[in-house]
């Protein structure tokens, strides 16, 4: 293996039941300092590839090995942490060498007071310890820990791991890994469970990171701003593309032109995203306003019939009237924490509202109040007479693992009636990228992203005209994300979407609802980038820096 590479794979293959070649004959070499984003459909083998590279999965064909002496750090989708540890104890494992050096240095200083000490030996040890501390900026160790904890919005230092949610555990594991500073980072969906500000911080951190980074992610701004290479997994093959995500889109469109006969819908979807990428910010802003202006056209039967040829199609519900949702002076608390404090806003016809904020800030609580599942402490929610809600929540466990994909959606019916439309059930399921034999897969065999698509297919068949989408982008591959964006943009109704995906919010949002500290929620007209720019101008750069969320305490 050439010393110019930190890692080499030679003819790597992987077979999974029932005799499916998920990876085929992959040969790749990784440069020091390279930043690589891994793309591919759900189930394409992205996580398998990282497990092989991390040395976790040893059952594969071919060779995969790092350069001798290279330290590899791996973030799996479900990292393992010691349940009895506190958050601080778990994170400090990453800097144990520096902490031990600091402790020992204090002991060495104390030993100088002994007149019988071997001063030459102590001086040599002192020099060695100081070199370790200086290399890791050890005298500022506490500041490093606090900055990282704030940036990733970690729970309190004293919180026990066993009491944390899955998302909180992932953030702790990510923080620990980044502080270790290995030569090569293997990250499986590092942006999952991070809010937009934490993702932006991670993006800057990895952009400046001196080591090699291989990241599976669906965050396309992340792929645009960090990645210098895209590794696409397509039908078992690993195809490297030099450039970032936007560059990959350009190259991919040219390749699809050569496969036009079989890829028409996919090419149409990529072309729409490319059109958006090529627009300047003013053009993007004008496009979001144009969506609301052409609301009547979106509602026409002829337009929706044309729209049915898209990759993913959200069936329209009843025609929406002028009044949609009005929220006035809404307040909601749990225990002594105020989640929402005096919130008022009005959703105009045709709006797509992106909802952002830290995990646990109360975004899903708002949806439960809008749908009548919970009541506010004070204030009111008023729905227009024509409003029919369709809700897609972030929990996808309410499916029967023994059923096939087709059975789960269709309940055995050949024809589905969705809103004012009738559609063959297999064609409808196919719209969510379950083609042919994939419709016969058991639900229990699906990957996280495939479950996400199935969940969308089930709940969108209700045919509402106002969609409440709670983290619909979680675990979706980039292809499905793009199709979902296009489907929402063509939907003849309104949508409120909880998401941390900045690219997604920039493409679809006409308004932003931002959950800040102490129950303060801001309603802004414009997409995510417009809102961030406004925040910087209004509140300064500090406003867009992540920090651990503060809850307003209720006066006793």
Curated annotation (Swiss-Prot):
Compartmental location: Cytoplasm
SUPFAM superfamilies: P-loop containing nucleoside triphosphate hydrolases
A single BP term in Gene Ontology: translation
Residues the record lists as binding ATP 2: 357-364
Summary of subunit composition and partner proteins: Monomer. Probably contacts ribosomal proteins L1, L5, L33 and S7, the 16S and 23S rRNA and the P-site containing tRNA(fMet).
Role noted for this protein: A translation factor that gates the progression of the 70S ribosomal initiation complex (IC, containing tRNA(fMet) in the P-site) into the translation elongation cycle by using a mechanism sensitive to the ATP/ADP ratio. Binds to the 70S ribosome E-site where it modulates the state of the translating ribosome during subunit translocation. ATP hydrolysis probably frees it from the ribosome, which can enter the elongation phase.
HAMAP family registered for this protein in UniProt: EttA
Record's protein name: Energy-dependent translational throttle protein EttA
Species name: Haemophilus influenzae (strain ATCC 51907 / DSM 11121 / KW20 / Rd)
